[in-house]
Structure formats: structure tokens, C-alpha cells
Amino acid sequence: MRRRNARGGISRTVSVYLDEDTNNRLIKAKDRSGRSKTIEVQIRLRDHLKRFPDFYNEEIFREVTEESESTFKEL
């Protein structure tokens, strides 16, 4: 189901499973900010993606070659 969001675009729903510690931290953060849990997640996820747009960059990954199926570098 598509819904319009406050920013004027179409929004998508994403479900996640959180461990107890992460959930408790999120609840404390939303209580401090006065926002809903959903809005707190949206803001924090958007911020993370802006600050770390290339989280998996070429320093960590390399292109798959014909000889290898692995995309991870040996660390």
C-alpha cells in the first residue's frame, strides 16, 4: 500500500526485527525527542545514509573475477 508522507512523496513500509538492546535505545531516543518511534527511525536512517552513502566501498569490496566467486577481500 502506498501512502503519502509529510515530505510530499510516496512512502514505503519496511519491517525490521530489533534486538532488545537496540529497541530499548530507540525507545529512549524517541522519548527524549518527543517523536514517535517510526519518525525516530526515519530520521536516524536518513541521517545514516546521508553521512555514510558509500558504506560498502571498493576498499572493502572488489569486483568478482572469473577465477573467484567471492566479493570480499581477505582481511
UniProtKB/Swiss-Prot annotation:
Q: What is its main location?
A: cytoplasm
**What are its GO cellular component terms?**
cytoplasm
Q: Which InterPro entries does this one have? A: TraY (IPR008876)
Q: Name one GO molecular function term.
A: DNA binding
Q: Would the keyword Ion transport turn up in this protein's UniProt record?
A: no
Question: How is this protein organized at the quaternary level?
Answer: Part of the relaxosome, a complex composed of plasmid encoded TraI, TraM, TraY and host-encoded IHF bound to the F plasmid origin of transfer (oriT). Interacts with TraM, probably through its C-terminus.
This molecule's function is given as: Conjugative DNA transfer (CDT) is the unidirectional transfer of ssDNA plasmid from a donor to a recipient cell. It is the central mechanism by which antibiotic resistance and virulence factors are propagated in bacterial populations. Part of the relaxosome, which facilitates a site- and strand-specific cut in the origin of transfer by TraI, at the nic site. Relaxosome formation requires binding of IHF and TraY to the oriT region, which then facilitates binding of TraI. Also positively regulates tra gene expression.
- Protein's UniProt name: Relaxosome protein TraY
Q: Which organism is it from?
A: Escherichia coli
* Lineage of source species: Bacteria, Pseudomonadati, Pseudomonadota, Gammaproteobacteria, Enterobacterales
